[in-house]
Structure formats: structure tokens, C-alpha cells
Swiss-Prot record:
<keyword id="KW-0694">RNA-binding</keyword>
<dbReference type="GO" id="GO:0006412">
    <property type="term" value="P:translation"/>
</dbReference>
<dbReference type="InterPro" id="IPR034704">
    <property type="entry name" value="Ribosomal_bL28/bL31-like_sf"/>
</dbReference>
<feature type="binding site">
    <location>
        <position position="18"/>
    </location>
    <ligand>
        <name>Zn(2+)</name>
    </ligand>
</feature>
<protein>
    <recommendedName>
        <fullName>Large ribosomal subunit protein bL31</fullName>
    </recommendedName>
</protein>
<dbReference type="GO" id="GO:1990904">
    <property type="term" value="C:ribonucleoprotein complex"/>
</dbReference>
<feature type="binding site">
    <location>
        <position position="39"/>
    </location>
    <ligand>
        <name>Zn(2+)</name>
    </ligand>
</feature>
<keyword id="KW-0689">Ribosomal protein</keyword>
<dbReference type="InterPro" id="IPR002150">
    <property type="entry name" value="Ribosomal_bL31"/>
</dbReference>
<keyword id="KW-0687">Ribonucleoprotein</keyword>
<dbReference type="GO" id="GO:0046872">
    <property type="term" value="F:metal ion binding"/>
</dbReference>
<comment type="subunit">
    <text>Part of the 50S ribosomal subunit.</text>
</comment>
<comment type="function">
    <text>Binds the 23S rRNA.</text>
</comment>
<dbReference type="GO" id="GO:0019843">
    <property type="term" value="F:rRNA binding"/>
</dbReference>
<dbReference type="InterPro" id="IPR042105">
    <property type="entry name" value="Ribosomal_bL31_sf"/>
</dbReference>
<feature type="binding site">
    <location>
        <position position="16"/>
    </location>
    <ligand>
        <name>Zn(2+)</name>
    </ligand>
</feature>
<dbReference type="GO" id="GO:0005840">
    <property type="term" value="C:ribosome"/>
</dbReference>
Length: 66
């Protein structure tokens, strides 16, 4: 590889919106993320079920579709 053209690869402190902090390697010294393995529903096992039927009924009522 040519010297002087690649970004510096360093330890990166990552902070999640839920408060979880961990370190990875990146070309940035720190990052903030919205979701991580501590708060993502896939990893936590808690799913949020959307009330799709209620939304459809609300739409039909709003536009008088019967």
C-alpha cells in the first residue's frame, strides 16, 4: 500500500442512544448510533407489534370507505 493516502485506523468509542458504550476500530475517534445489540428488538427478544388492523380501520373511517 502507498504511504500517506490512507486514513488512520484507530480505536473508536461508540455510544448508543440507550446508553450502551463499546469500542471498535474505525477511521473516526468516536461515533454515536441510534440502536445497538443491547436495545434492538431482534437481540432483546421483545418485539413491538404494530396495530395494523387498527390503522386500516382508522384510514377507512377517515376517508369514509366503509
Amino acid at each position: 500500500m502507498r504511504k500517506g493516502i490512507h486514513p488512520e485506523y484507530m480505536e473508536c468509542k461508540v455510544t448508543c442512544a440507550c446508553g450502551n458504550k463499546f469500542e471498535v476500530r474505525s477511521n473516526k475517534p468516536e461515533m454515536s448510533i441510534d440502536i445497538c445489540n443491547e436495545c434492538h428488538p431482534f437481540f432483546t427478544g421483545s418485539e413491538k407489534i404494530l396495530d395494523a388492523a387498527g390503522r386500516v380501520d382508522k384510514f377507512k373511517k377517515k376517508y369514509n370507505l366503509g
